[in-house]
Amino acid sequence: MSEMQMPEMRYILPSFVEHSSYGAKESNPYNKLFEERIIFLGTQVDDASANDIMAQLLVLEGLDPDRDITMYINSPGGSFTSLMAIYDTMQYVRPDVQTVCLGQAASAAAVLLAAGTPGKRAALPNARVLIHQPATGGVQGQVSDLEIQAKEIERMRKLMEETLARHTGKSAEQVRIDTDRDKILTAEEAKEYGIVDQVFDYRKLSAQN
């Protein structure tokens, strides 16, 4: 995916040239990660990031349906519909999807973190996970429209609760209680809650031991 769209950022993304028997090839960190079957969600969850992630999942499945895909997450969350689009694609593709939180996985991103393949969900030691109810935005319009929107908000809320319950082992009722207000978890607390399976040690420390 040499034309992969780069996330918006304030710093200059470095590029580098790789030399091989086939000649020279210019690359960048995101293309290099993709070659290693790594997807990086480092922005809010919206239609643009969802489309990019879904495309990468589908292409990586086509390249090798038997090799794991790893998704690194550092995201403040975002759109519920975009979340479910990514979620469905993660469950649809054949490869196992390992999820790793570095930085934060908040709101929609926390659900994606939990949705990784069981036993293959992790967080770095100082990662932060936040779960809460889906954001609804301003509700306005005539009475009949308000009723329709109210039903949709409740449907979204129930779907999010059932999804988190499915992947954490909690009951939907417990998830509703826990997400009624912002619930902030450390990496170890996220492990206890069932959002991740392990907290990764630093590679340097692992190498020294």
Swiss-Prot record:
<feature type="active site" description="Nucleophile">
    <location>
        <position position="107"/>
    </location>
</feature>
<dbReference type="Pfam" id="PF00574">
    <property type="entry name" value="CLP_protease"/>
</dbReference>
<keyword id="KW-0378">Hydrolase</keyword>
<feature type="active site">
    <location>
        <position position="132"/>
    </location>
</feature>
<dbReference type="GO" id="GO:0004176">
    <property type="term" value="F:ATP-dependent peptidase activity"/>
</dbReference>
<comment type="function">
    <text>Cleaves peptides in various proteins in a process that requires ATP hydrolysis. Has a chymotrypsin-like activity. Plays a major role in the degradation of misfolded proteins.</text>
</comment>
<dbReference type="InterPro" id="IPR023562">
    <property type="entry name" value="ClpP/TepA"/>
</dbReference>
<comment type="subunit">
    <text>Fourteen ClpP subunits assemble into 2 heptameric rings which stack back to back to give a disk-like structure with a central cavity, resembling the structure of eukaryotic proteasomes.</text>
</comment>
<dbReference type="GO" id="GO:0051117">
    <property type="term" value="F:ATPase binding"/>
</dbReference>
<dbReference type="InterPro" id="IPR018215">
    <property type="entry name" value="ClpP_Ser_AS"/>
</dbReference>
<dbReference type="InterPro" id="IPR029045">
    <property type="entry name" value="ClpP/crotonase-like_dom_sf"/>
</dbReference>
<comment type="similarity">
    <text>Belongs to the peptidase S14 family.</text>
</comment>
<keyword id="KW-0720">Serine protease</keyword>
<dbReference type="GO" id="GO:0009368">
    <property type="term" value="C:endopeptidase Clp complex"/>
</dbReference>
<dbReference type="GO" id="GO:0006515">
    <property type="term" value="P:protein quality control for misfolded or incompletely synthesized proteins"/>
</dbReference>
<keyword id="KW-0963">Cytoplasm</keyword>
<dbReference type="GO" id="GO:0005737">
    <property type="term" value="C:cytoplasm"/>
</dbReference>
<protein>
    <recommendedName>
        <fullName>ATP-dependent Clp protease proteolytic subunit 2</fullName>
        <ecNumber>3.4.21.92</ecNumber>
    </recommendedName>
</protein>
<dbReference type="GO" id="GO:0004252">
    <property type="term" value="F:serine-type endopeptidase activity"/>
</dbReference>
<keyword id="KW-0645">Protease</keyword>
<dbReference type="InterPro" id="IPR001907">
    <property type="entry name" value="ClpP"/>
</dbReference>
<dbReference type="InterPro" id="IPR033135">
    <property type="entry name" value="ClpP_His_AS"/>
</dbReference>
